[in-house]
């Protein structure tokens, strides 16, 4: 553990997680005073650093750093960590072992290691948390659902803009967001479906299907990338949420064009008799920032500024009501 810094009402310490031949930057944030609990922040898809920025695309929502520091102000410790990818600070230590990270299941392995590290580091610092919560953002919510089912030390799960369907289903919903003026959404989705038929069979997408409305960006993914996407898509998030035994808080923004509002309702319905609460914020986007109406999806995704503190207010209030398992 290195680089201890003070951040207002918190201390932040940089760590490295070593899992399956790779080293991941992570940051432990510890509040001043009594610790109400600890939150593991599980990142979503794409190449994000520990703060929740995307250096490869120069998109910097800073969402995980904002959440961590707001949580600390509310008395909660947290751990956030990077994902493999350009500019995120991850390092390959053993190339043969690191092949494991081409499998979606390894995301759960990394999250489990991060959870154990968070608990150990807090205990060593004399700040053991009375309750532990796993908060997964976007695709990270799916990881959180899978982790919590086999983690008795987890007292609660927070679904932050989590999907209720597989990744290819989410991609299909987004097809209409990237069309030129006048293009037909129905035609674009038909093109997308034709391309995905090849992906589901493990085939390369034919060249004649690339570059059409609905498939403009699909040519950037190679066969290995599609193999990984198929693994993610094979998981049914709503079904996995139903199997989570812990209490769950679902947080959703009404102007989220990446994972739309109906997913929150579908996950809540899938929970059945499970203890579930929904915190809905009509004007927030995917990174929980207020979004002016009519903002184009790509501009919405790149929005900077502080993450709305009402999200952490909801997490902290809900979390304090959880009885430790």
Task: Explain the meaning of each model-derived region.
Residues 2-34, 38:
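N-terminal cap/lid segment of alpha/beta-hydrolase-fold proteins
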Residues 33-35, 39-73:
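Short, surface-exposed "cap/lid" segments of acyl-processing enzymes
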Residues 99-122:
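Alpha/beta-hydrolase active-site loop
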Residues 117-178:
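Primarily recognizes the serine-hydrolase "nucleophile elbow" in alpha/beta-hydrolase
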Residues 158-239:
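Accessory cap/linker subdomain of secreted extracellular hydrolases
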Residues 244, 250-252:
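Short beta-strand/loop motif that positions the catalytic acidic residue
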Residues 246, 259-269:
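Short alpha-helix in the alpha/beta-hydrolase fold that links the catalytic acid
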Residues 287, 293-325:
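Catalytic active-site module of serine/aspartate enzymes centered on a nucleophile-bearing elbow/loop
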């Amino acid at each position: 553990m290195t680089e201890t810094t003070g951040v207002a009402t918190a201390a932040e310490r940089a760590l490295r997680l070593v899992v399956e031949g790779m080293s991941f930057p992570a940051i432990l944030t510890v509040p001043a005073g009594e610790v109400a609990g600890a939150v593991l922040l599980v990142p979503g898809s794409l190449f994000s650093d520990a703060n929740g920025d995307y250096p490869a695309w120069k998109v910097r929502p800073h969402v995980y750093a904002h959440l961590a520091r707001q949580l600390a102000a509310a008395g909660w410790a947290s751990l956030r960590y990077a994902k493999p990818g350009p500019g995120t600070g991850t390092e390959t230590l053993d190339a043969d072992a690191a092949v494991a990270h081409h499998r979606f299941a390894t995301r759960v392995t990394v999250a489990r290691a991060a959870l154990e590290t968070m608990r150990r580091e807090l205990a060593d610092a004399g700040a053991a948390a009375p309750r532990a919560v796993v908060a997964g953002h976007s695709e990270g919510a799916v990881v959180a659902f899978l982790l919590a089912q086999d983690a008795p030390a987890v007292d609660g799960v927070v679904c932050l803009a989590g999907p209720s369907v597989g990744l290819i289903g989410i991609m299909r919903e987004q097809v209409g967001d990237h069309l030129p003026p006048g293009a037909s959404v129905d035609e674009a989705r038909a093109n997308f479906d034709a391309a995905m038929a090849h992906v589901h069979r493990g085939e390369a997408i034919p060249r004649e299907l690339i570059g059409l409305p609905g498939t403009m960006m699909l040519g950037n993914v190679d066969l290995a990338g599609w193999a990984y996407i198929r693994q993610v898509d094979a998981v049914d998030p709503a079904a996995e949420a139903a199997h989570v035994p812990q209490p769950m808080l679902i947080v959703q923004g009404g102007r989220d064009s990446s994972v739309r509002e109906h997913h929150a309702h579908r996950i809540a319905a899938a929970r059945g008799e499970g203890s579930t609460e929904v915190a809905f914020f009509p004007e927030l986007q995917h990174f929980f920032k207020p979004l002016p109406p009519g903002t184009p999806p790509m501009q919405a995704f790149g929005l900077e500024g502080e993450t709305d503190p009402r999200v952490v207010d909801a997490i902290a209030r809900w979390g304090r009501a959880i009885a430790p398992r």
